[in-house]
Amino acid sequence: MADVSIPVSEPFNAKKGSPYNNGGLAPRAYDDAPQKGHRVHHCLNFIVRLLTAMASAAALTTMVKSNQGPARWRDFWAFKWFIIANAIVLTYSTLAALASLLGEWTRRGPLSSTPLAWLTFLVDFLLANALMSAASTATAISWVGRKGQPNAGWEAQCVAVGGFCRRVLGALIASYIGWVLLALSTILAATAIHRLRRRSAVAN
């Protein structure tokens, strides 16, 4: 008995690049997404990355310029770690923002494939934890300098170096804002992974 092949007609509104017009190949996981939804996702990711870079830059700059008399950030390992962590987040967020902007135009950004989305998620997660670690240790030192520790005989120092303490406080606030934005980037990456896995399951 001869094989009978049943032709499948493509919809009348099938566009170029759609699952019905890709040369008979299986639909790709992310390229099948509506262009508008794809661009909105990458645009939101770009905005969050840019704001994260700005917050980290503000925290880094404020801490570096916080010196007042004998009070210097170089004398505290917690503040050194704070600057290193924010510098790493600033560099990463800037590069990630550029990648997101490129992905919005080319549809080949960091959230366009499952491996890249997983890598983005893991890096965001690790850097968010590192930034929280740096901010929390710097907050502890700042709190002791502002309030002192009577049981240990440590007196508050911010009365003598108020400008230093105010600038450190500003840097801490900016860093915590950067952490919130970085956590939001992690959520966006997790959302992209979910969407990619769902489309891959539908395609299979």
Curated annotation (Swiss-Prot):
Main location per the UniProt record: membrane
Name this polypeptide is given: CASP-like protein 1U4
Cytoplasmic side: 1-43, 103-114, 189-204
Family per similarity comment: Belongs to the Casparian strip membrane proteins (CASP) family.
Any single GO CC term annotated in Swiss-Prot or TrEMBL for this entry: plasma membrane
Transmembrane segments: 44-64, 82-102, 115-135, 168-188
Family annotation (InterPro entries): CASP/CASPL, CASP_dom
Subunit structure, interactors included: Homodimer and heterodimers.
Cell compartments where the protein resides: Cell membrane
PANTHER family reported in the protein's UniProt record: CASP-LIKE PROTEIN 1U1, CASP-LIKE PROTEIN 4A4
Coiled coil segments of this chain: none
Annotated keywords: Cell membrane, Membrane, Transmembrane, Transmembrane helix
Membrane topology reported for the UniProt record: Multi-pass membrane protein
Parts of the chain on the Extracellular side: 65-81, 136-167
Organism in which the protein naturally occurs: Physcomitrium patens
